[in-house]
Amino acid sequence: MPSLWREILLESLLGCVSWSLYHDLGPMIYYFPLQTLELTGLEGFSIAFLSPIFLTITPFWKLVNKKWMLTLLRIITIGSIASFQAPNAKLRLMVLALGVSSSLIVQAVTWWSGSHLQRYLRIWGFILGQIVLVVLRIWYTSLNPIWSYQMSNKVILTLSAIATLDRIGTDGDCSKPEEKKTGEVATGMASRPNWLLAGAAFGSLVFLTHWVFGEVSLVSRWAVSGHPHPGPDPNPFGGAVLLCLASGLMLPSCLWFRGTGLIWWVTGTASAAGLLYLHTWAAAVSGCVFAIFTASMWPQTLGHLINSGTNPGKTMTIAMIFYLLEIFFCAWCTAFKFVPGGVYARERSDVLLGTMMLIIGLNMLFGPKKNLDLLLQTKNSSKVLFRKSEKYMKLFLWLLVGVGLLGLGLRHKAYERKLGKVAPTKEVSAAIWPFRFGYDNEGWSSLERSAHLLNETGADFITILESDASKPYMGNNDLTMWLGEKLGFYTDFGPSTRYHTWGIMALSRYPIVKSEHHLLPSPEGEIAPAITLTVNISGKLVDFVVTHFGNHEDDLDRKLQAIAVSKLLKSSSNQVIFLGYITSAPGSRDYLQLTEHGNVKDIDSTDHDRWCEYIMYRGLIRLGYARISHAELSDSEIQMAKFRIPDDPTNYRDNQKVVIDHREVSEKIHFNPRFGSYKEGHNYENNHHFHMNTPKYFL
C-alpha cells in the first residue's frame, strides 16, 4: 500500500530530525565552556529538554492538541534545522533549543493522541529515525550531515519541510484519541506500568543509545588498543554494529524471544560490562551483543511509556530529567577538573552505565510483558494494517542496513586505494596541533578546513590533540577515522574513549608497525594520554612519542607526567621524535626532565617564546622548524619539523647552523610557500602564515 510506505518514510525522516536535534544541543552547549574551561551559564539552555513539563498543565495540554498550535510547533521543530545557518553560535544555540523543546512536545502529543495505527507509525518512525541517522553518518564518515555541511543541511531541511507539511494535514484527529472498548480499558488499567519507572527507563534508553550507538564506529573506539592488534577497525566493523542494531529491533517480533526475562537482562548487563572492561575483539563482540540488547529494549520501553498514563507530561518530564542527569554525569566523568562536584564523578562511567542498566532492567522485569506492537494492536479492524505496517517497516529497516553496508564498503575501498601512495624517502616531517574537537573558535565544524590545512603542510606524521569527539556531548564524531580517510593516512586513535581523556591521535603517511597507549599519572587533574609508536618510513623504523600533559596549575601531575614520558623516550630506539603539549616554559623543570632524562634535543633551543607545544628528537638530522598561525581554526598554532634519517644512526653529524633564507637550502626540504615566508613575531591576521620567527632551516 503506497500510503503505508509514505507514512513510514515520512515518520522515519521526522524521527531522524528529532534525534539530530537532541544530539546537537549537547555539543552546542559544550562549545561555550570549552572556550573558558569553566561553566558559562549557557548550560541553562539544557532545560529545553524539560519542555514536556508544561503538558502537566491541563489548559496547555488542551492548547497543544489544537491543530493550529501543533502546526506551529511542527514548523518550529523543522525550522530549527536552519539554526546551522545562524550568524553566530549563541543565536544558533537559542534556535536549536527552541526546536528541541518543540520537538519533544510534538512527540508527546502525537504519541499519546490519534488512532492506534497513527501512534504506532509515529513511534516506530522515531525508532527507525535512529537507524536512518546512523546510516547517514556512515555515508558522511561519522558526521551528522545536518550539522556538518551547508548543502546537506539545506537538502534535509527541504525534505523535512515537505514531510512536515504532509503531517500537518494528518494532525486533525490528534485531539480525538481512538476509543477503547470497556474491556480493553479495564485490562489496560490493571496492567499499567509505573509512570515514574517507565519515564526513567525511556530517558535512560535514549541516552544509552546516544552514548554508545549514536554512530556505528563508537564500539570500536571503546574497544581500541595499540598496533599491531588494535581491535576491529570502525570500517568495516561498523557494519556488524549496524546489523546487530537492526537484529535487536526485530527480536521482539519473534515468538520465541523472551525479552522480558531475567536471563536476557543478565546477558545485556554482562555485554555492557564486557564493552567497558574487556579489550579489542572481546570488547567489540560484547558491544555487538549489547547493541542487540539495547535495540530490543526499544519496543517494550516505548510501549511502557505510552501506556503509563493518559497525560504524557509527567512521564516525559521524568524521562528527560534522567536523560539530562546522565549526559551531564557523562561530561562530568571527563571534565571533572573544571566543574563543581567533579571529584565525585571522576572516571565513573561504570556507575553511569550500571545505573542505566538497573533502571532499564527494573522496567523490563516489573512492567507489563507486552511490547509496543501488542499494546497498540487492539482493534480487530486494524490488525491487517498493523501486519502490513510491520512488514513494510521490516523491509525498510533492512533496506537501510543495505544502504549502510554499501556506504561502508565504498568508503573502505576508497580508503585502501589512498594508503601507501608515497615515494621512498630519507626525509620525514612531523607536526603537532591541538584540534579542539573539530570546532573552530566561532563554534562551527572545522573539519574540511582543517583537512585542507593539514594537507597543505605536507607533514608525514601528525599528532592531533583534543581529538576524542566520540563522546555524546561532543557530537559522537570519529575525527580519527574522518581525517584518516580524507587524507589517506594510517591512523591510531589513541587511548580508548572509555578512559576519559580528551583524546590524542596519530596520523601517519607511512605504516604504523606497532604502538602502545598510555595513561600518564594524573592524581589531581585531567587524565593525560600518550602514545608511543614505531613507523616504517621507507624501510627505516622511527619511533614517535606523542603526549598531552595536564594543566599548568596541576604541578604534581606535570612533574609525574614528565618523569613518565622521559622514561618512554629513554626506552625508545636510537631514532625518536617527540611531539608534546607540556604546558611548561623552555628550561623549566619539566622541559629539563624530558631533554636530560629522556635524552632528546629540542628542535630549536633558541625559541624561548613557547609554552605548550614542543618538538624534540634523537638520532636524526634536523632540517627545518616552522610555526603556523591558527587563524581562528583552533586556539593553538601548528608546529612542524623536518628531519633526515641518517644512513648510519651511530655515525652521523647533526645540523647546527641556523638560516632563515630558504634559498640557502635544498628546495625539497622547503616548507610550503603557501604559508608565506619568514615572519618575526605573532601573526595576528586571520590567515595561516608562518610566524614567531620561523621558518628556520638547519645546515
Curated annotation (Swiss-Prot):
The keyword S-adenosyl-L-methionine does not apply. GO terms for biological process: brain development; cell adhesion; cerebrospinal fluid circulation; cilium organization; GPI anchor biosynthetic process; membrane protein ectodomain proteolysis; neuromuscular process controlling balance; peptide secretion. Belongs to the PGAP2IP family. It is found in: Membrane. This is PGAP2-interacting protein. It comes from the Eukaryota. One of its GO terms (cellular component) is endoplasmic reticulum. Involved in lipid remodeling during GPI-anchor maturation. Glycans are attached at residue 455. Pfam families: 6TM_1st_PGAP2IP (PF23022), 6TM_2nd_PGAP2IP (PF23021), Exo_endo_phos_PGAP2IP (PF23226).
